[in-house]
Amino acid sequence: ILSGQIPAGTEMTQNELAESLGVSRMPVREALMILEYQGLIIRLPNNRIKAADLTEETLRQILALGAQLERQAMRALPQDAMLAGGEMLQHRTLRTVLPYPLHRKLLESIQETYIAFAVSARPTPVNDRLARLLMLDRQGSPDVPDAWNAYEEELLHLILTIRSQYAGTETH
């Protein structure tokens, strides 16, 4: 759904989905609960579901919310803490310092669904981006908002590029 292989608005029943995957309805039902939580499907009456319409603006808002929570997490990090490891490990580390379980769960959903999808699409890893954002933030740099916006736009562009490949369209 996120890649665009299943077009927005596509409707199907749990039974149709289970049959097409060759599995029983129970694992499909469990998977659909996760997809609904991640914002990728919408439940309809009579055990039907519909693929969510993930417009560019919707994706931009989701990534902005994730960035807002990650900036909050950066401020909660101990002053001597560093972000190490690959890009996704750095995202996951930030999630652990958020004080409220709801914020951690929301950020987990954004990170593991949308950010991980974008990061996996990158031709070469960029492992120091969050560490550099943390450094800028700790230095009180006025460039922090612009740096975060650039990072969000990069992730958005990666997602839109993959989606356009499946839709046969160009990204802008």
List the predicted regions and their residue ranges:
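Eukaryote-biased recognition of C-terminal alpha-helical segments
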Residues: 111, 116-120
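Short linear motifs at protein or domain termini
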Residues: 1-75, 167-172
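Short, hydrophobic secondary-structure boundary micro-motifs
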Residues: 8-10, 44, 103-107, 145
